[in-house]
Amino acid sequence: MPMHFLLRYELSPDYLARRGEHRDAHLSLAWAAADREELVLGGVVGDPVEEALLLFRTREAAEAFAAADPYVTSGIVTGWRILPWRTVVGEDAAEPVRPA
């Protein structure tokens, strides 16, 4: 069954204070994944920031991204998990479903 995969990041309480040191490397990794059409969207959630979500086309791409992400390896991401997401509405839906 076609799906997208959400990479969900739990962030350290001092995420905003610490991210600057690793931000360029993180964004380079993210844009490279987007250029390969693996990463659809990504960013932080909340104001103030609560967590981050990144939407991938495959579980493997999400796993590889998390393993290489400087935010993860530096510890400012304190936990992560990948959630399968059966997208059914929108131009980029993995499995578009229209009303009968």
Region annotations inferred by a language model:
Residues 1-100:
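Conserved, structured core segments of small domains
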